[in-house]
Regions:
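C-terminal accessory helical subdomains adjacent to catalytic cores in phosphodiester-
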Residues: 2, 16-32, 43-59, 64-152
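Conserved helicase/translocase motor-coupling segment
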Residues: 6, 33-36
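Small/polar loops that bind or transfer phosphate-bearing groups
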Residues: 10-11, 37, 93
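Nucleic-acid-processing active sites and adjacent nucleic-acid-binding tracks
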Residues: 38-42
Length: 152
């Protein structure tokens, strides 16, 4: 695994912040480049793929709170056909990042994680958070409960 190149595609800046934290300061997931690209709504292009290094493992992180899967399926098939892509890994968030964090931390409301005044401020506060790894640890983050629920 140490020689593999990983490239994460995530839905938004909040997912990017969480993945960057999990792979760097917390060292809970494999390191790799992280780009914001909503694979449920947008299609990959050849130009995007040309920027990848040979043998890249592509990790798609996406919400499951939508029934629109056609573009996602097209993206998976497109990536699987690219010789530069070694493997495609899908990480469904059930139903979204907030639900994943609620499930994997000892919190009742998402605002508790960031100390936000309201749940609606959570995303902004998470993205701006200076020490997310500490906040996750303080609230008992359990990686084994994160991204583990079956989306069915």
């Amino acid at each position: 695994m140490a020689n593999n190149i990983y490239h994460y595609y995530v839905e938004g800046d909040d997912e990017k912040k969480v993945i960057d934290t999990l792979k760097t300061s917390m060292q809970l997931i494999i390191s790799g480049k992280v780009d914001v690209f909503n694979v449920i709504e947008r299609k990959f292009t050849r130009n995007q793929i040309m920027r990848l290094k040979q043998g890249t493992i592509v990790v798609l992180v996406f919400d499951t709170d939508t029934n629109q899967v056609d573009t996602l399926l097209e993206n998976i098939l497109f990536l699987q056909k690219q010789p530069i892509v070694k493997k495609v890994i899908c990480v469904p968030q059930v139903k979204n990042l907030e639900d994943e964090l609620l499930r994997s931390c000892n919190i009742k409301q998402i605002k508790e994680l960031t100390g936000s005044k309201s749940n609606s401020n959570y995303k902004h506060d998470l993205i701006q958070h200076k020490n997310l790894s500490n906040a996750l640890k303080t609230h008992g983050f359990n990686i084994e409960k994160f991204w583990c629920k079956d989306p069915s």
